[in-house]
Design a protein with these regions (language model features):
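Histidine-centered active-site loop/cap adjacent to the catalytic His
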Residues: 330-361
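Serine-esterase "nucleophile elbow" of acetyl-processing enzymes
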Residues: 78, 138-141, 146-221, 225-232
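A short helix->loop->beta-strand "cap" motif at the edges of active sites that frequently abuts
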Residues: 267-272
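Oxyanion-hole/transition-state-stabilizing segment in secreted/luminal serine hydrolases
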Residues: 221-257, 262, 277-284
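N-terminal secretory targeting modules
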Residues: 9, 17-179, 354-361
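Sec-dependent N-terminal signal peptides
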Residues: 4-13
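Short hydrophobic segments within beta-strands
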Residues: 86, 183-184, 275
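Substrate-gating cap/lid alpha-helix
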Residues: 280-318, 361
Length: 361
C-alpha cells in the first residue's frame, strides 16, 4: 500500500513537471476583466479602452481611435497551465509600417522567474477575430505568475486568456505601486517597438515597480486642453509628460503655461514632471529636421526654466534614447527597443527622486 501511494505521488509530480502540451489540447477561456487588468487611467464602459470618448469630447477622429486602443494595458494572472493562448475580438486595428505587427495587434507575455524578475516568455499576433492565438506551449505545470501586455495600437472588445482544460487560472495581485499618469506622443504609445512590453513606460515599470498609466497618442500630444480634462478626471498620484515631442516651438510657447495652470487648478498638490524631448536621429544630416527639433528643445528648456520657478510641484528632466553612435532609431524619429531602453534608464533616477520627495516610494 505504501509503495502504491509513493508511486501515485511520483506519477502526479511527474505529470506536474512534464513539459509537453498534448497535441489535442483543449483550451478553457477566461475574460481578462475577470483577472487583473492594470494600467488604466480610469474605468471605461469598454474596459479595454483608455478613455471614455462618450464622456470626454474634443478629440479628432484619429485621437478617438488612439484613446480606444489598449496601449499600456496588461493582464496579471496566475496559472499552472503548460500552454497560454489569447482569443480576441478586435475593433480598429492599425497596420503601420514602422512598427512590428506583434506590437500593434499582438500580445506580449512575461513570466516571473525564481528571483521575482519579470522575464520575456512569448509574443505573437494573428489579427483574427475570435481566433485562438497560441502564445506558448510545453511549459512545466508549476504555478506561474504572468503579465500579458495588450496591443499598443488596436481596439479590443473582448480579450480571453486560454489555458488547458483542468489547469487553474486566477487573478494575480499587482506588484506595481502608486498610480502615475504618463501623457505623450508616439514615443509614449510605443511606436516602433518590436512588442508591447518594450515601450519606455513599460520598461520603466518593470525596472522600478512604479505603475505608469499610459495616455500615449501618436502625433497628438500637443498640450490640448481636452487631454488635460482627461488627466484631471483621473485618480493619480503624479503625472509625467512627454509634451514637447509633437508640438512646434510656437505651439509650445502658446500652450504650455495654460496647460499647466489648468491641471494645477484641479490638482495643486501632485507633481507634474515634464520631460525634454529626445534627440531624433533624423537630425544627424538633415538640416531642416535639426533646425526644427532644436527650436522645440530650446523653447521647452526656456519655458520650463521659468515654469519650475513660477509653479509649485512642477519639474523638468532630461531624456536620452540614443547611444554615442547615434544609431538607435527605426525611422529617424522613433527609437528601437534599444533606444527605448536608454530612455527608460535615463529618467529612472530623476523620476524616482521626485516621487520620493512627494512621499511616493
Amino acid at each position: 500500500m505504501k509503495r502504491l501511494l509513493t508511486a501515485t505521488i511520483l506519477a502526479a509530480l511527474a505529470f506536474a513537471a512534464t513539459a509537453q502540451t498534448p497535441k489535442n489540447v483543449q483550451y478553457s477561456f477566461t475574460e481578462a476583466t475577470e483577472l487583473n487588468l492594470i494600467g488604466k487611467l480610469m474605468d471605461t464602459p469598454n474596459p479595454y479602452h483608455r478613455v471614455d470618448t462618450c464622456r470626454f469630447k474634443g478629440f479628432t477622429k484619429g485621437e478617438n481611435d488612439q484613446v480606444r486602443c489598449s496601449a499600456g494595458l496588461a493582464v496579471l494572472f496566475r496559472t499552472n497551465s503548460s500552454t497560454i493562448s489569447v482569443k480576441s475580438e478586435f475593433g480598429y486595428m492599425n497596420h503601420g509600417e514602422n512598427t512590428m505587427g506583434i506590437a500593434l495587434r499582438g500580445y506580449d507575455l512575461y513570466i516571473k522567474d525564481a528571483d521575482g524578475k519579470w522575464v520575456y516568455a512569448a509574443s505573437k499576433a494573428d489579427g483574427r477575430n475570435r481566433g485562438n492565438c497560441v502564445l506558448i506551449k510545453d511549459m512545466d505545470r508549476s504555478e506561474k505568475e504572468c503579465m500579458l501586455y495588450l496591443p499598443i495600437y488596436s481596439e479590443e472588445y473582448s480579450v480571453q486568456i486560454g489555458v488547458e482544460e483542468g489547469a487553474t487560472i486566477e487573478a494575480l495581485e499587482s506588484p506595481f505601486r502608486h498610480r502615475v499618469a504618463i501623457f505623450g506622443s508616439s514615443f509614449t504609445q510605443g511606436i516602433s517597438v518590436s512588442r508591447a512590453g518594450m515601450s519606455y513606460p513599460m520598461q520603466f515599470m518593470r525596472n522600478t515597480g512604479i505603475q505608469l498609466l499610459s495616455l500615449g497618442c501618436s502625433g497628438n500630444c500637443k498640450l490640448q486642453p481636452y487631454f488635460a480634462d482627461v488627466l484631471i478626471a483621473a485618480d493619480v498620484d503624479a503625472m509625467i509628460f512627454d509634451a514637447f515631442s509633437n508640438p512646434s516651438a510656437q505651439m509650445i510657447k502658446e500652450r504650455l503655461f495654460p496647460f499647466i495652470e489648468k491641471i494645477q487648478a484641479a490638482k495643486p498638490d501632485i507633481p507634474l514632471i515634464f520631460m525634454q524631448t529626445i534627440y531624433r536621429e533624423s537630425r544627424n544630416f538633415c538640416k531642416s529636421s535639426d533646425s526644427f527639433e532644436q527650436a522645440k528643445q530650446e523653447m521647452a528648456a526656456t519655458l520650463m526654466e521659468e515654469a519650475v520657478k513660477k509653479y509649485d510641484n512642477v519639474y523638468f528632466i532630461q531624456t536620452n534614447a540614443s547611444d554615442p553612435s547615434k544609431d538607435t532609431s527605426v525611422d529617424g524619429t522613433r527609437p528601437s527597443d534599444w533606444g527605448y531602453m536608454y530612455w527608460a534608464k535615463s529618467i529612472e533616477k530623476p523620476v524616482l527622486k521626485i516621487l520620493r520627495k512627494h512621499g511616493l516610494k
